[in-house]
C-alpha cells in the first residue's frame, strides 16, 4: 500500500477500496458531503451552528470536483468509497461517483478525527482500531445538533478505547486540533450518550477494548450523513464512513500553538 497522499488517491481512483485510518500519517483527512445548491446554505448554516462535529475546512463552487486541500485531486473518484442518498435513504455505495455528479452540487469538506490520530499515536497512545485492522466505530447519539433551516439531526461520535493512564494525554493532544473535532465530547459510560452497546456501532466496525481501556468519544464528521437521513435531503453524495479524502495538507497546519506563558 502506498503511503503518499497522491499515490493513495491514485490507488483509490484505480479501484482500491480500504478504510483510510492509519494511511498517509502526517496528512489531514476529510469527510465529504455534496448537496444540491438549493440546500447548500442550510447545510452551511448547520455546520456553522455545530462546529464540533462539523468543522468546515473547504467549500467548493457549485459543480466543482476539486478542492484546495488536495490540488489535482478529483473528489468524485479519489476517495475509496462513497454513499449516494436519495430522499434521505441510502441508494448506493460505490467507489466512483463521477457519472452521478451534477453541476448544482456543492461539496463540503469537513475535518476528520483521523487527522489527530498521527500525533496521538506518536505520543505513544495505542489506536485499537488500527491495531486490529478495522474501521473506527461510530455511533448515533441522543444529543441533537442545533437545527438550521431544513436541516437537523443527531450528533454522531467516533470511539477510541484508550488506556486509563493515557486518557488525559489523548484528550490534550486532540484538543489542540479544533479544526478536526478537537477534544473528546465524552469519556467513559456510553449510555450517557444514548449508546446501548459498544459492540454494535451504527457505522464502522466494533473494536475490542483491552483491560484497563476507557472509551473516549469524539464528535464525528458523519454527523451530516445523519442529518441527511433525518432531514430527507432529495439528493446527496457523501464519503462512506471511514473512507475519507486524504489531502495534501499536513496535519500540523491544524495544530493550535500554545502561547508561551513567560
Swiss-Prot record:
Its EC number is 4.2.1.-. Signal peptide: none annotated. Pfam families: D-Glu_cyclase. The keyword Lyase applies. Keywords: Lyase. One of its GO terms (molecular function) is lyase activity. InterPro entries: D-Glu_cyclase, Putative_hydro-lyase, UPF0317. Belongs to the D-glutamate cyclase family. HAMAP family: Hydro_lyase. NCBIfam families: PRK05463.1 (NF003969). This is Putative hydro-lyase ROP_32680. It comes from Rhodococcus opacus (strain B4). The lineage of its organism: Bacteria, Bacillati, Actinomycetota, Actinomycetes, Mycobacteriales.
Amino acid at each position: 500500500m502506498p503511503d503518499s497522499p497522491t499515490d493513495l488517491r491514485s490507488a483509490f481512483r484505480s479501484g482500491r477500496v480500504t478504510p483510510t485510518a492509519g494511511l498517509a500519517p502526517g496528512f489531514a483527512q476529510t469527510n465529504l458531503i455534496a448537496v444540491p445548491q438549493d440546500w447548500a446554505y442550510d447545510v452551511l448554516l448547520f455546520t456553522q451552528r455545530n462546529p464540533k462535529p462539523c468543522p468546515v475546512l473547504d467549500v467548493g463552487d457549485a459543480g466543482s470536483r476539486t478542492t484546495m486541500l488536495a490540488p489535482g485531486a478529483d473528489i468524485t473518484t479519489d476517495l475509496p468509497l462513497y454513499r449516494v442518498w436519495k430522499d434521505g435513504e441510502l441508494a448506493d455505495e460505490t467507489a466512483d461517483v463521477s457519472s452521478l455528479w451534477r453541476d448544482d452540487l456543492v461539496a463540503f469538506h469537513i475535518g476528520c478525527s483521523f487527522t489527530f490520530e498521527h500525533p496521538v499515536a506518536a505520543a505513544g497512545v495505542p489506536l485499537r482500531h488500527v491495531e486490529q485492522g478495522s474501521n473506527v466505530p461510530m455511533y448515533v447519539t441522543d444529543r441533537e445538533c442545533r437545527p438550521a433551516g431544513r436541516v437537523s439531526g443527531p450528533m454522531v461520535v467516533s470511539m477510541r478505547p484508550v488506556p486509563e493512564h493515557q486518557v488525559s494525554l489523548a484528550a490534550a493532544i486532540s484538543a489542540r486540533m479544533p479544526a478536526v473535532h478537537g477534544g473528546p465530547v465524552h469519556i467513559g459510560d456510553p449510555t450517557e450518550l444514548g449508546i446501548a452497546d459498544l459492540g454494535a456501532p451504527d457505522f464502522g466496525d466494533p473494536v475490542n477494548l483491552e483491560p484497563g481501556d476507557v472509551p473516549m468519544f469524539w464528535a464525528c464528521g458523519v454527523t451530516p450523513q445523519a442529518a441527511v437521513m433525518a432531514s430527507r435531503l432529495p439528493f446527496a453524495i457523501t464519503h462512506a464512513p471511514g473512507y475519507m479524502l486524504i489531502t495534501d495538507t499536513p496535519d500540523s497546519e491544524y495544530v493550535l500553538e500554545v502561547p508561551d506563558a513567560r
